[in-house]
Swiss-Prot record:
GO terms for cellular component: cytosol. It catalyses: N(1)-(5-phospho-beta-D-ribosyl)glycinamide + formate + ATP = N(2)-formyl-N(1)-(5-phospho-beta-D-ribosyl)glycinamide + ADP + phosphate + H(+). Its EC number is 6.3.1.21. Homodimer. GO terms for biological process: 'de novo' IMP biosynthetic process. N(1)-(5-phospho-beta-D-ribosyl)glycinamide binds at residues 20-21, 80, 284, 354, 361-362. The keyword Methyltransferase does not apply. This is Formate-dependent phosphoribosylglycinamide formyltransferase. It comes from Shewanella baltica (strain OS155 / ATCC BAA-1091). InterPro entries: ATP-grasp, ATP-grasp_carboxylate-amine, ATP_grasp_subdomain_1, PreATP-grasp_dom_sf, PurT, PurT/PurK_preATP-grasp, PurT_C, Rudment_hybrid_motif. Involved in the de novo purine biosynthesis. Catalyzes the transfer of formate to 5-phospho-ribosyl-glycinamide (GAR), producing 5-phospho-ribosyl-N-formylglycinamide (FGAR). Formate is provided by PurU via hydrolysis of 10-formyl-tetrahydrofolate. It is an enzyme of class 6 (ligase). Residues 117-306 form the ATP-grasp domain.
Length: 391
């Protein structure tokens, strides 16, 4: 049952994290009459601008997080980022609070160690070789055992922060320092992974719903500096590789439990598929689904967490997204060239309305459909390039 916002019978959902992905989730929740409460570490975050009300707290502060949940008494608590006091969510779930998809899933996926050990050691899924390191001495030993090239990431980071590829052992100290600076909680534990010379990488959006497990068409993407720049759907792959990908994604999602959409990241090399990471929430590469599917990843996530069925997912055809990236310092961001960016048929824009910028930041995305993937990517890139960010 869903009531009406601001009434006694309202169904209340609290978003922990109010960025561009949370904003789309908030919109989809409101389309189904859910009262939305946004929570983030800074004011006027994108999802706060469309939520019914909002709170600014340090979400790594266990007491502050507990206090806001106890104040609002939401029926659903929906983590949309990793930087949260997850043990508080575990404790509150045990007290009866409904954490989406589960507090365990949120805690396991908050850091790379929890989910990598679940995938490789518990589920026996194929992954790259890896070591976890607390000191630079352990780090150097791991590199010598794995060899170069190898990938270094803080166990707690996002958007490529602190991530690098070591191709020369002489650069290992620099990579260690960069990883220490890039972690969400400051310096700390890192993972050193063997580099898989993959043919391509995909995000397989996997939905656990009341009527079973569902998959979106695979999404291909290009990364730069550890963050996505373009994504496209569908990624071409054989039926055999798709079946292997879906089998891996199903195992991970079923092990994490709960209802919702999961972004499962996989590497493909020939006929082999390797597990990389998973997010128990919509994925940034999945922004392409805003134009590629009848139900976007955000709509699917909301249906699943509300316990609603997903009869089918229709993919419209070759589609792409291209990031609108800017670099600078401003609290008065403006955009020009929007009309030019939307001149071509089957193009759309999403401007995230982030309140400020200090350094490099993703501020929007261009979306496009065309006759094939290459054309769709080219059209999305062209559209994105026409948007000029003014400070």
């Amino acid at each position: 049952m869903i009531g009406t916002p601001y009434t006694e019978g309202a169904r209340r959902a609290m978003l922990l994290g109010c960025g561009e992905l949370g904003k789309e989730v908030a919109i989809e929740l409101q389309r189904l009459g859910v009262e939305v409460i946004g929570v983030d570490r800074y004011a006027n975050a994108p999802a706060m601008q469309v939520a019914h009300r909002s709170h600014v707290i340090n979400m790594l502060d266990a007491n502050a997080l507990r206090a806001v949940i106890e104040l609002e008494k939401p029926h659903l608590v929906i983590p949309e980022i990793e930087a949260i006091a997850t043990q508080t969510l575990v404790d509150m779930e045990a007290e009866g609070v409904n954490i989406i998809p589960t507090a365990r899933a949120t805690k396991l996926t908050m850091d790379r160690e929890g989910i990598r050990r679940l995938a490789a050691e518990t589920l026996g899924l194929p992954t790259s070789p890896y070591f976890f390191c607390d000191t630079e001495t352990e780090f150097n030993q791991a590199i010598s055992e794995i060899g170069v090239p190898c990938v270094v990431k803080p166990v707690m980071s996002s958007s490529g922060k602190g991530q690098s590829v070591i191709r020369d052992i002489a650069l290992s100290h620099k990579a260690w320092q960069y990883a220490q600076e890039g972690g969400r909680a400051g310096g700390g534990r890192v993972i050193v992974e063997g580099f898989i010379p993959f043919d391509y990488e995909i995000t397989l959006l996997t939905i656990s719903a009341v009527n079973g497990i569902h998959f979106c068409a695979p999404i291909g993407h290009r990364q730069e500096d550890g963050d996505y720049r373009e994504s496209w759907q569908p990624q071409a792959m054989s039926d055999e590789v798709l079946a292997k990908s879906q089998a891996i994604a199903s195992k991970v999602v079923e092990a994490l439990g709960g209802y919702g959409l999961f972004g499962v990241e996989l590497f493909v090399k020939g006929h082999e598929v390797y597990f990389s990471e998973v997010s128990p929430r919509p994925h940034d590469t999945g922004l392409v689904t805003l134009i590629s599917q009848d139900l976007s990843e955000f709509a699917l996530h909301v249906r699943a967490i509300l316990g609603l069925p997903i009869p089918n997912i229709h993919q419209h055809g070759p589609s792409a997204s291209a990031v609108i990236l800017a670099e600078g310092t401003s609290s008065n961001i403006r955009y020009q060239g929007i009309a030019a960016a939307l001149e071509a048929v089957n193009t759309q824009l999403r401007l995230f309305a982030k309140p400020d910028i200090d350094g490099r930041r993703r501020l929007g995305v261009a979306l496009a459909r065309d006759i094939d993937i290459d054309s769709a990517v080219s059209k999305a890139l062209d559209s994105a390039s026409k948007v000029k960010v003014i400070f």
